[in-house]
Amino acid sequence: MQTNKRLKMASCVKAAAMLGMLLSVSISTTAQADSWRGWNIHPPSYPNGKALESFAKEVAEKTEGRVEPKVYHNAVLGDQPDAIEQTRSGALDFANFNMGPMGPIVPAANVLSLPFIFKSPDDMYRIMDGEIGERFADALAEKNLIVLSWFGSGARSLYNTDHPVETPDDVEGLKVRVMNNDLYVQMIDEMGGNATPMAYGEVYQSLKTGVIDGAENNYPSYESSGHYEVANYYSLTEHLILPECLCVAKASWEELSEKDRQAIREAAEDAAKEQRALWEEGVQASKQKILDAGVKINEVDDKSAFQAKMQPIYDQFVQEHPELESLVTDIQDAQS
């Protein structure tokens, strides 16, 4: 009897030990799998949404499941200012941010909102992919945001109901809707126009009824909003070309091995290539649609006259932010 009891007890001890080992392995495996939450303001069908989904899939594959990102689209986790703070604190793991609203966090980002700071989207990509882009990335890193790659958001151009805009003088007297930003109000005013900040949803009817004469936006937005139906002169001023960043929270980044960091950087670079290509496809599709509708599109080959008109804006900006003067100059010199 004593022998049987000892055998039963030994069996129980072995079973308990084995169960403990299994639980340990299970807990260890769970701990190694890091579920990342990502923020995106756009719908999943948008170029950014598609590229971010590709990023999430590639990260999971390249890290062999150690990092499993999930993208939350349509700003369901908050608006951009909220998402910026959540990512800085580590409550969110990654996000795609437009650099326009980043100014209150990173003052250098305000340089990117200066009218005509970039001559073309290609110039913007080239500059942001190089040493100057690294400066912006360093500034963001100081605020706990690790930049992995740069996306594009198109080039905003002027459109109106009356005539092509080929020189700044062609803006004189036009009532132009702009975003509620002092830089953009001043941009139109410096060209002799009447800047009119207005809610985006009111623009179509205001163009149709003559409350305003024009507005400004990129090809896809001009087309999808239907503004081309009531304002059929689209002039490629490309006065505002804002980059976007694919960022990771510093807290999340510091938990990674060097191997996984490299894999995630590669996935982010692939996502940037995809986003840029998809954006260009969307631009071409929108352009063809508005051409088919009879919109008159004109190139603005020489932007120097427009840039000269912006000098008072630049002078005021540098006076208020003297520490950013060299950054402004370096971006301009890189396109000369």
UniProtKB/Swiss-Prot annotation:
It is found in: Periplasm. Gene3D superfamilies: Bacterial extracellular solute-binding protein, family 7 (3.40.190.170). GO terms for biological process: transmembrane transport. GO terms for cellular component: outer membrane-bounded periplasmic space. GO terms for molecular function: carbohydrate binding. Its main location: periplasm. Beta-D-glucuronate binds at residues 42, 80, 156, 177, 200, 217-218, 244. The keyword Transport applies. InterPro entries: DctP_fam, TRAP_DctP, TRAP_DctP_sf. Keywords: Periplasm, Signal, Sugar transport, Transport. Residues 1-33 form the signal peptide. Belongs to the bacterial solute-binding protein 7 family. Solute-binding protein that binds D-glucuronate (in vitro). Probably part of a tripartite ATP-independent periplasmic (TRAP) transport system that mediates solute transport into the cytoplasm. The complex is comprised of an extracytoplasmic solute-binding protein and a heteromeric permease formed by two transmembrane proteins. This is Solute-binding protein Csal_2479. It comes from Chromohalobacter salexigens (strain ATCC BAA-138 / DSM 3043 / CIP 106854 / NCIMB 13768 / 1H11). The lineage of its organism: Bacteria, Pseudomonadati, Pseudomonadota, Gammaproteobacteria, Oceanospirillales. The gene is dctP.
